[in-house]
Amino acid sequence: MHKIIHESEMDFIADNSFHIEASDVYKNIGEGVRTVEFIRIKNDVLHFVEAKPSFPNPNNPNKDNETKFQSAIDKICEKFIHSLNLFLSVEIGIAEEHYPDDFFRPTKPSLVFLLVIKNHMDEWCRPVKQKLDAELPHYIKKIWNPRVYVINERIASEQGFIVSTKDR
């Protein structure tokens, strides 16, 4: 039986995960810091997972939508960066937090920023990914070399990130 984290109307498989959003270190830090839902290690990859029930359509040229889309992109980038910094502050001992007993960290992980959008068309994922890639600060890309993925609920289920609706 898998550990589950319920976020944005989806049930995420949370084996080998640190629920950073629910952690004491995050709760005690106060305003001004945003975080992803959780960090999951799967196949020596640190996945910083952000979940959304919906997201502005990247193909809608309406000015109001463009503003909402850019604002959403900015917030997601901020969450990825803040979460990476908060996680590393725990890793090097600046911030104190106790990881779950089953949270085992690889010695040489790679890094993925993963955005899962529940109600999102397949063809909308790529433009969101491209925009996130473009908006991540250059120094983050140079230092950490993260891969960015944007997937919907169907793809997340196929890739083993969420419990399939058929399995519920």
Give a label for each model feature.
Residues V45-H47, V112:
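Structural motif
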Residues S54-L114, H138-I143:
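Catalytic cores of nucleic-acid endonucleases
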Residues D122-R168:
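Polybasic (Lys/Arg-rich)
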